[in-house]
A protein has these predicted regions:
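Negatively charged
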Residues: 1-367
């Protein structure tokens, strides 16, 4: 019913839904979507959505649309979503200046894929308290949001979600991300979850349950401004892939991975690549790392400016292939516990052990 009513328009000044009986409407898929232009004002003050089930792409705009037109925010205060199941792409690519949907009832929603992807002008999005307990698809829900500054997802209970890969990736302007009470207890995949959040300085993940996660590769990569990262609740007992997990996170300090269980991890390639750049001469404590399953650690510590790496005898490279292979490149500040200083070309896995007389290495036994 009423799908694509705005299709092929240019710049419509007003869509006034007053006087139209929509009380029996179940499907509004692509209803206000347009591929040619924008709508200046949409009046939904008497819009009856009490039976609406499908709001997919309802207010969306194609990502490739380019416009300098100024449009008005939509008043959603009377928008009834109690029966809505589909919100796929609902606001994808939207030019709305703001989206206030704090009154939305999402208890029956199952699909939120692309719901807020590619927003062009929205800087603040408050979704705290949404009932997302039935949602089973949040793929790329926030993808391409390069202008969003703050995002509040407090108390999201995502118990039906198994994959959160790339969930917040590419949110370059984001400085405030509230994940208090955000649950992840059934998630198995978190790869690239926070990649390229360039402006984020603080990230508190203390509510995360990661006990079922197997993939954390590139999880925090390229977070250039991130200084404070709370991983205190992290259970990594089932993780097998930590490749480039903290790559280019140069200002996180301290980088506390003391809760990590690494007994099943097979890949640590570039895990600490270009980390601990500031302050220089810092300490990296991986004394809890048990690397019995490790098969690849190529470039694991490349370019870090750490002076001390605490480790234990449980850190072993016996299974890496090929062995030896390069693990330390330009670690010019690094000094082992017996005084062995990093020098080129001594950059291989042969030095990935505790420094001792007659057996030079780059690690230090923790006091």
């Amino acid at each position: 019913m009423l799908a694509n009513i705005n299709d092929n328009s240019t710049l419509v000044q007003l869509i006034d839904m007053r006087g139209i009986n929509t009380s029996r409407m179940k499907n509004a898929h692509h209803m206000f979507w347009t591929k040619e232009g924008l709508t200046k004002h949409i009046d939904l003050s008497e819009f009856d959505t009490s039976n609406l089930e499908d709001a997919g792409y309802m207010f969306s705009t194609p990502y490739e649309t380019v416009s300098t037109a100024q449009i008005d925010p939509i008043d959603f205060s009377h928008f009834n979503t109690s029966k809505v199941k589909i919100m796929t792409g609902m606001f994808a690519g939207s030019y709305l200046p703001s989206i206030d949907i704090r009154n939305f009832d999402t208890r029956n929603v199952v699909d939120m894929q692309y719901t807020f992807a590619g927003l062009k002008n929205v800087r603040h999005l408050d979704l705290h308290g949404f009932d997302v307990s039935k949602v089973n698809n949040i793929g790329a829900i926030f993808s391409g949001n390069s202008t969003l500054v703050s995002l509040n997802l407090a108390n999201w209970q995502l118990d039906s979600i198994h994959a959160m890969d790339s969930l917040f990736a590419g949110m370059h302007a984001l400085t405030d991300l509230n994940l208090t009470g955000f649950t992840t207890k059934n998630v198995t995949d978190m790869h690239h979850m926070f990649t390229e959040c360039h402006a984020l300085t603080t990230l508190d993940l203390s509510s995360f349950d990661t006990s079922k996660v197997t993939d954390m590769n590139n999880m925090f990569r390229d977070n250039f401004a991130l200084k404070n990262l709370n991983l205190s609740s992290f259970n990594t007992s089932n993780v097998t892939n930590m490749k480039e997990m903290f790559r280019h996170d140069g200002v996180i300090y301290p980088l506390d991975v003391s809760t990590f269980d690494t007994r099943k991890v097979t890949n640590m390639d570039g895990m600490f690549y270009w980390t601990l750049m500031s302050p220089e001469n810092a300490t990296l404590d991986i004394s809890n790392f048990d690397t019995r399953s490790l098969t690849s650690a190529l470039g694991m510590f490349n370019y870090t400016k750490a002076k001390t790496i605490y480790a234990s005898d449980q850190f072993t490279v016996n299974n890496v292939a090929p062995h030896p292979h390069e693990m330390f490149i330009t670690n010019t500040n690094l000094v082992g516990g017996n005084g062995t200083q990093y020098v080129w070309p001594n950059n291989s896995s042969q030095y990935a052990h505790i420094d001792a007389p007659g057996n030079p290495g780059y690690f230090t036994r923790k006091p």
